[in-house]
Amino acid sequence: GKMLDVPVGTAVFTVDKYKRMKKADIICLDYSQDMLDRVRYRFTEAKITDIKTLQGDVGAMIFHDESFDFILCMNGLHVFPDKDKAYSEILRTLKPGGEFLACFYVAGEKRISDWLVNSVLTRMGWFTPPFDTANDVRRRLEQYYEILDFNIEGAMLYFRAKKR
């Protein structure tokens, strides 16, 4: 099927898997031109030539409605400035029955993580408030998705959800 990876970042966690997915139709999107330059270099080094990389905003994606079978969002939702628009665009571009897979920081799980996020990572511009709690995310998902997996490890939430 067709997959969107947003934000792709540097693809440090996905490049080896993508290398083995020869027949997959994958589009990698990121707002940061610097990240795209890095991922293109990484893909070139790994001899990956069939994955599209695009610069764009998750809150205003150029894709048609119901374009993707899978949307992967690794370490993205805590970075996006407008979480509501990001969730809305992901929902809009995912086909019915398509899967939304994500992992990201959630507030209220580990005090040390909350302190680090608020005192350091947000000030450096790497994370963007407001931050959802796991319950906030569950409420967002339950309206439109069947939640297939929902796990918290430390201050990271990992989920897999199927669009109704």
Residue ranges and their predicted role:
Residues 2-60:
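Class I SAM-dependent methyltransferase SAM/SAH-binding core
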Residues 59-70:
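A short acidic, Gly/Pro-enriched loop at the edge of an enzyme's catalytic core
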Residues 34, 81-85:
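Short N-terminal helix/helix-N-cap motif within the alpha/beta-hydrolase-1
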Residues 70-82:
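A short SAM/SAH-binding and catalytic strip from SAM-dependent methyltransferases
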Residues 101-159:
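C-terminal alpha-helical "lid/dimerization" subdomain adjacent to the S-adenosyl-L-methionine
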Residues 21-22, 81, 95, 142:
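Short conserved AdoMet
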Residues 84-96:
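A short glycine-rich, Lys/Arg-flanked "PGG" loop and its adjoining helix->strand segment in the class I
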Residues 2, 98-99:
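Short glycine-centered segments of the SAM/dcSAM-binding site in methyltransferase folds
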